Amino acid sequence: MTDPVCLKTGFAAAMTSMLGTDLPQKMAVAVSGGGDSMALLYLAADWARLRAIEMAVVTVDHQLRRESGEEAALVKQVSQDLGLPHTTLAWRDWNGQGNLPDAARRARLDLINGWRGPVQYVLMGHTQDDQAETFLMRLRRGSGVDGLSGIAPVHDVMASKIDDPSG
């Protein structure tokens, strides 16, 4: 079992590495309800509270699985228990054409960017499996050396920053 103090210390170090000492007033965490994003929610809520940073929570319900609404409701309840405002954004635009995972990812980023307002940073959690999957998908697509990587710790998306403290 991972030591919670070490986990919190490691998270704080990752955040400092990404943000430096100029901390934002407002941040958000994108939470799907999966283990990676729920862990991120708890860590980010604690980290932000200790630094007087206003934290909000956003969930994108892609409505592709029957249980997705229940997962969004669970995230809302946990967020409220932590004293954090929560918003669920629904994606209804899948037309059945093309690459579903890519369309869902793009929709998630677009919806979050449309929602975020003055929030400068949105944290997103990813597991090691997500990292490996991203690397393998890029390899399969024939990415060159520059394109062969996992998910970058910081993404600049539409003039906003989307951060992944799991690096």
Report residues per predicted region:
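Core alpha/beta nucleotide-donor-binding catalytic domains of modification enzymes
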Residues: M1-G167
